[in-house]
Amino acid sequence: AQVIGADTAGHRRLVDKGFTHVVDLQEQAAAAFIPVKLEKPFKSLQKGRMEKKQLTSGDPSGFKPLKSTHERYAEVFRRLGYHAKPGPGDILKGEAWPKNFDDGMAQSGQLRVGLAPFAAHAGKCYPEPQMKELIQLLGAVPHIRLYLFGGGQREIEVLGSWEEAYPYCKSVAGKIPLTEELALISNLRLMISMDSGNGHLAAMYGLPVLTLWGVTHPYAGFAPFNQPEANSILANRKKYPAIPTSVYGNKVPEGYENVMESIPAKGVYNRVLEILQESQI
């Protein structure tokens, strides 16, 4: 990849590269000037901003599933004439267990489950008391091993304390580079995630991803790739009818601070057991 400025000199360099098409995958107005200068076919991502605005307006008539983000990206290339139809087989190949992460737990026959308990916004994070309840429930499952994912000093400290408290937990946070984290993820049986990046990374390897949704909702099109509806566990919309309050979870209206408390840990646990049983068939 190479970054080329959008000025006149940059346009000349693009011409020299011999490009035949221009694609804007950010739906940025400035990008429209590039194909004008280059006189090349141009297609832009359609994010569906108006649809998403209606979805997050609180108006019941706007509450309907929107096109997935994966499909929106594929659509751009189809409009250029390419075959782009993401399917179940479009996943990354699994990698070897990272050599630099010999935790004494990665033995054959064990159920390796990832747990990514954090997200960019508080309205998308499962409360710590319920997360600990879930961890304790999962700890009773024979041969289970939980690998904890996060980043940043505070998350590293929290996950480290959980590792000390629960012998079947191992924190990955801050211990190995991203490339090795990805290799580790590819060896898991399941990823439990918030509406956050770790779930998407796991889905890239074809893993089952169980996502817990707070003030956001999969109808906005950001559910991990190729996951069944049953793998989305939602906050109670009867109690919190304004969900989704925003697309990214950065807006938490008054009274919606504790939406994720409406997701019982036992319900998450039961779905984990179902997924693990399904993967053994």
Whereabouts are the PLM-identified features?
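Catalytic machinery of carbohydrate-active enzymes
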Residues: 1-281
